[in-house]
Swiss-Prot record:
Protein name: Pro-neuropeptide Y
Species in which this protein is naturally found: Dicentrarchus labrax (European seabass)
Entry-linked PANTHER family: NEUROPEPTIDE Y/PANCREATIC HORMONE/PEPTIDE YY, PRO-NEUROPEPTIDE Y
Main location: secreted
Cross-referenced Gene3D superfamilies: 6.10.250.900
GO cellular component terms, A-Z: extracellular space
GO biological process: feeding behavior; negative regulation of adenylate cyclase-activating adrenergic receptor signaling pathway; neuropeptide signaling pathway; positive regulation of circadian sleep/wake cycle, sleep; positive regulation of feeding behavior
Molecular function as annotated in GO: neuropeptide hormone activity; type 2 neuropeptide Y receptor binding
Xref: InterPro entries: Pancreatic_hormone-like, Pancreatic_hormone-like_CS
Described function: NPY is implicated in the control of feeding and in secretion of gonadotrophin-release hormone.
Length: 99
């Protein structure tokens, strides 16, 4: 085989692989509900608006990483805000002898 043909086949294979990976990623994304139309019955419109609200909640939800786990937040709050010892708190600059 010619080196040029092997290069083209490798490039084509990589592009096909990349398209397959992108296709797999898009399957996990929720599908927007279809609008039933203006003259649809009230029940269908209610179902549509419920599905639309669910869709919007899915695509706009906050995604938290490992740093935002509740255990770490509880630890930070207890360490930073709820300390009982005062030796690490900043001292006041108030000096009664100046007054």
């Amino acid at each position: 085989m010619h080196p040029n043909l092997v290069s083209w086949l490798g490039t084509l294979g990589f592009l096909l692989w990349a398209l397959l990976c992108l296709g797999a990623l898009t399957e996990g994304y929720p599908v927007k509900p279809e609008n039933p139309g203006e003259d649809a019955p009230a029940e269908e419109l209610a179902k549509y608006y419920s599905a639309l609200r669910h869709y919007i909640n899915l695509i706009t939800r906050q995604r938290y990483g490992k740093r935002s786990s509740p255990e770490i937040l509880d630890t930070l709050v207890s360490e930073l805000l709820l300390k009982e010892s005062t030796d690490q708190l900043p001292q006041s600059r108030y000096d009664p002898s100046l007054w």
